[in-house]
């Protein structure tokens, strides 16, 4: 990586002006308890609300997730009663995407305020085909197990930064890509 960087300057894409429309696909399974928090998080994103379409895909949820989502008229909800898994749910949602950018996230993943702009900014580079988010685990003092998970994701993030510097991506965490 260091040798490559001696000969090639790092990329620094700019955010397109005007900002393009984007769709945020939110995968959910029995997420009744998190709907309100996720919607607050979505409303706090630093991206124009009129340019960010929110689509929730609930796959086989048998709690009150869909009822909670009815409280948000700006949201499109795609529900399937039979659970087929996250990949099938996301694939089912793709035909509803009418924007040039689609961003996948999970209902229980809270996004950084600038996440959408940062993802869109990276796509200004025509060589970019996928952008992966960086997962940060909030460590709960009473839950020692999350400390190990936090260390793992720091390691994964370091590997992804190396991937980026080599103009490649081996994978993306399912929480944000």
Positions of predicted regions on the chain:
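Cell-envelope/extracellular polymer assembly enzymes that use nucleotide-activated donors
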Residues: 20-23, 53
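N-terminal membrane-anchoring/stem segments of glycan-assembly enzymes
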Residues: 1-18
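Glycine-rich, basic loop-to-helix element that forms the pyrophosphate-binding segment
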Residues: 80-97, 117, 154, 171
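Short, acidic, metal-binding catalytic loop of nucleotide-sugar glycosyltransferases
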Residues: 40-51
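Conserved donor NDP-sugar-binding/catalytic core segment of glycosyltransferases
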Residues: 113-147
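A conserved acidic beta->alpha catalytic loop
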Residues: 41, 58-66, 82, 109
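Short aromatic/hydrophobic "clamp" motif used to bind/position activated sugar donors
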Residues: 102
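Acidic helix N-cap motif at the loop->helix transition within catalytic regions
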Residues: 33-37, 62-71, 114
């Amino acid at each position: 990586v260091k040798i490559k960087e001696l000969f090639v300057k790092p990329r620094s894409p700019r955010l397109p002006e005007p900002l393009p429309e984007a769709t945020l696909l939110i995968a959910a399974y029995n997420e009744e308890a998190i709907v309100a928090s996720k919607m607050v998080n979505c409303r706090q994103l630093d991206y124009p609300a009129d340019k960010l379409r929110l689509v929730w895909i609930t796959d086989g949820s048998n709690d009150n997730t869909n009822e909670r989502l009815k409280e948000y008229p700006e949201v499109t909800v795609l529900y399937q009663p039979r659970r087929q898994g996250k990949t099938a749910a996301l694939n089912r949602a793709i035909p509803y995407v009418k924007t040039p950018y689609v961003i996948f996230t999970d209902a229980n993943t809270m996004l950084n305020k600038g996440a959408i702009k940062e993802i869109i900014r990276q796509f200004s580079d025509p060589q970019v085909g996928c952008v992966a988010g960086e997962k940060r685990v909030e460590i709960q003092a009473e839950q020692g197990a999350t400390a190990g998970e936090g260390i793992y994701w720091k390691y994964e993030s370091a590997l992804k930064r190396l991937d980026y510097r080599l103009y490649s991506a081996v994978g993306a965490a399912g929480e944000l890509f």
